[in-house]
From Swiss-Prot:
Residue spans of biased composition, Basic and acidic residues class: 1-13
Lineage: Eukaryota, Metazoa, Chordata, Craniata, Vertebrata
A single Gene Ontology CC term: mitochondrial outer membrane
Low complexity bias locations: 82-91
Subcellular location: Mitochondrion outer membrane
Domain of life: Eukaryota
Name the UniProt record assigns to this protein: Solute carrier family 25 member 46
InterPro entries (UniProt xref): Mitochondrial_sb/sol_carrier (IPR018108), Mt_carrier_dom_sf (IPR023395), SLC25A46 (IPR039158)
SUPFAM superfamilies with a match to the protein in the record: Mitochondrial carrier
Any GO BP annotation: mitochondrial fission
Key words of the record: Membrane, Mitochondrion, Mitochondrion outer membrane, Repeat, Transmembrane, Transmembrane helix, Transport
Organism: Xenopus tropicalis
Length: 416
């Protein structure tokens, strides 16, 4: 085994020694203090052999020696322990990175790409007050998806996806800038107080106020029919949102509601969705951690398995939080989308037939009038039009989570 020290080293008492000239043996360390790792406590200093501290990836050890893992067999030779710990830690590190990247990519794909056709159908059903079929069943949603793709192609199910990313980017950017200038907390720590909660929710509310015109433009792109309109440009959402604020651009109908009327229901829906999803997420994580006791790190393969298992509770918590928030706020979302789409001269696909178009000519005066009109003309189930799309969306999400877990469990078993 060849030493991995450099040929030249400007350390203290090095160049003048015979070892520094290359014609002597390796001298023992003469420091009078025990070496410690950054993560070690006072009673664990005897487990380390390096000085200065053993930084992961460094080679400042004795020739042929490496830092043993805590809890490893102290009777084993230093070379054997070092080789075993190095191979297991390097393999675990690669698998952890691969697992984190793959699981994050699968979650991102599911939430933003795979779920988008369900979001398109869900919004079209919500704003279609002409519809006689409420599309409450997932089977009817699958049937209408097939009809749309047959007449317009697969592109019709992913319309407006670019604008949704733009709205998310505007939301994140606005939140960061507002937090920087107003010093409102973006996140809550464990020692929160009512003042911090109020400031945090105020920040979220201000973000939803800024996003409101762009959300309207994005909603139009996701529900308008591909039969009538051409594909919008990538930045059309930005231009239409700014034009909505400045009263410029395409002329709208007189029934168009002003942004001040749309701001309150938009902020209300956003704040309630955030509160519900955050509460459900923390509760699910609490019960999962309480149900599965913490495991002490063992050998390399078990450590990798434990590390992989740490990813999925958070994904499950996010899944449950989004599902509960979407289900509980579905009636309010239906009202919100109808108010946003009113007066925009939007023509949508006929969700009853799948091969025709219908115009949106509603005449709601505000939030309260929209609720009363839906209840009077469409009944209580009118607030849940297109609910089958939610069932399809989260069923696909659950399937992807399960497949991802099976794949990475197989990877870990193969590596071990």
């Amino acid at each position: 085994m060849q030493p991995r020290r450099p040929d030249r080293f400007d350390g203290l008492e090095y160049r003048g020694t015979s070892w520094g000239r290359g014609d002597g043996d390796v001298p023992p360390y003469q420091h009078g203090f025990p070496a410690r790792s950054f993560s070690s406590s006072g009673d664990l200093s005897q487990h380390w052999v390096t000085t200065p501290p053993d930084i992961p990836g460094s080679r400042n050890l004795h020739w042929g020696e490496k830092s043993p893992q805590y809890g490893a067999d102290s009777n084993a030779g230093p070379a054997a322990v070092g080789e075993e710990s190095s191979s297991s830690s390097s393999g675990g590190e690669h698998l952890n990175r691969f697992a984190g990247f793959g699981i994050g990519l699968a979650s991102l794909f599911t939430e933003n790409v795979l779920a988008h056709p369900c979001i398109v159908l869900r919004r079209q059903c919500q704003v279609n007050y002409h519809a006689r079929n409420y599309q409450l069943s997932p089977f009817s949603i699958v049937n209408i998806m097939y009809s749309f793709t047959k007449t317009q192609g697969f592109r019709a199910l992913w319309k407006g996806m670019g604008s949704t990313f733009i709205v998310q980017g505007i939301s994140l950017g606005a939140e960061g800038m507002l937090s920087e200038f107003t010093h409102l907390p973006r996140e809550l720590n464990h020692k929160w107080n009512p003042k911090q909660i109020g400031g945090h929710l105020l920040l979220k509310g201000l973000v939803y106020v800024i996003v409101t015109p762009f959300y309207s433009a994005s909603l139009i792109e996701t529900v308008q029919s591909e039969i009538i309109h051409d594909n919008p440009g990538i930045l059309d959402c930005l231009k239409e949102g700014i034009g909505r604020v400045l009263n410029l651009g395409v002329p709208y109908s007189k029934r168009l509601l002003p942004l001040l009327v749309l701001t309150f229901p938009t902020v209300l829906h956003g704040i309630l969705h955030y509160i519900i999803s955050s509460t459900i997420q923390k509760c699910v994580l609490f019960f999962i951690k309480k149900k599965s006791p913490a495991q002490l790190p063992g050998d390399g393969s078990n450590a990798v398995q434990n590390k992989l298992e740490d990813y999925f509770p958070e994904l499950i918590a996010n899944f449950a939080a989004s599902l509960c928030a979407d289900v509980l706020l579905y009636p309010l979302e239906t009202v919100l989308h109808r108010l946003h789409i009113q007066g925009t001269r939007t023509i949508i696909d006929n969700t009853d037939l799948g091969h025709e178009v219908v115009p949106i000519n509603s005449q709601y005066e505000g939030l309260k009038d929209c609720i009363n009109t839906i209840k009077r003309e469409e009944g209580g189930l009118g607030f849940y039009k297109g609910f089958g799309a939610v069932v399809v969306q989260y069923t696909l999400h659950a399937i992807v989570l399960q497949i991802t877990k099976i794949i990475y469990s197989s990877v870990v078993q193969t590596a071990s």
